[in-house]
Amino acid sequence: MGRVIVVGAGVVGLTCAVRLLEAGHRVDVVARDLPLETTSSVAAAVWSPYSHPQQHVVRWARAAYDTFAALCDDDTSGVVMRTGTELFREEGGDVWWREALPPGAGPDRETSLPPGYASGLTMRTPVVEMPVYLGWLSGRVHQLGGSVTRLNLSALPAGDALVVNASGIGSRLLGGDPSVVPVRGQVVLVEQVGIDHWWIDAATPAYVVPRSRDVVLGGTAIEGEWSRTPDPAVARTILERAAEIEPRLAGARILRHKVGLRPARPAVRLEREGDVIHCYGHGGCGVTVSWGCADDVVALADG
């Protein structure tokens, strides 16, 4: 098979590279930002579908769920299964992506809710510790014979190779797509205080996602904002909201503040255009749909 150049070393680009390598392609990943410098490294990364087109998101998310569930058997992957609850301010809140969950994973009605919430859906989903997982993905690329190289591009590569454009927000320039906009997300990492249940507010960017050594508290979703500098006032609000959801977080030691720019678009772009396969615009849903999207990229490459 021919050579493929994947542009972008976030979770989508690396996952596409792994699937292409597994399918027998020769793959080189090039990116301005290496994996731990990408927005993907900031993600709390609890499997939780959203974005459009919904019918594809459900399919992509289910494929990713199944792959992540299998990766839980690998202690080096950074993937674990955790039970958590999506919270609603109104009675009878529901999710449109129920069918993306496998049998037995939920969602089930939750009766023990934080103050201010009228209903909740509890389910068992993958939670991905991104600094560990991005290292695992990079290692898998190299193990399969691929490479990951820092390269600052002003345009997509031209030549005989097939190109996969997984450049995220970089697709404004590289893909000539002004519909891709940044959605600023700020998080606070605090010490792990014995929490193993995740919480997501369905109506706001507030969430509490426990990991092995810390807890990720979010967040914000400010469209069109490019600043990567943490805002102390926003951090205080994040901490206050998190403590309302999970009181054990009150006074937890702060470890780090982080900001990422989600690459949002009215709908994910996953299509082939000549010798370029575009796969970007996932917003904050990149981890959740990553393996399903990568499967479609391979199908387009082989088709």
Identify the meaning behind each predicted range.
Residues 3-28:
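N-terminal Rossmann-like FAD-binding beta1-loop-alpha1 element of flavoenzymes
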Residues 22-40:
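Glycine-rich FAD pyrophosphate-binding loop
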Residues 44-49, 82-88, 171-200, 239-249, ...:
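Central beta-strand plus flanking loop segment that forms part of the substrate or channel wall
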Residues 55-63, 120-136, 229-234, 289:
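Short beta-strand to alpha-helix junction loop
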Residues 66-144, 265:
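Flavin (FAD/FMN) cofactor-binding and adjacent substrate-gating region
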Residues 82-83, 87-93, 239-302:
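Flavin (FAD/FMN) cofactor-binding core of flavoprotein oxidoreductases
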Residues 146-159:
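A conserved short coil-to-beta-strand element within the FAD-binding core of flavoproteins
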Residues 195, 212-214, 222-261:
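Flavin-binding catalytic cores
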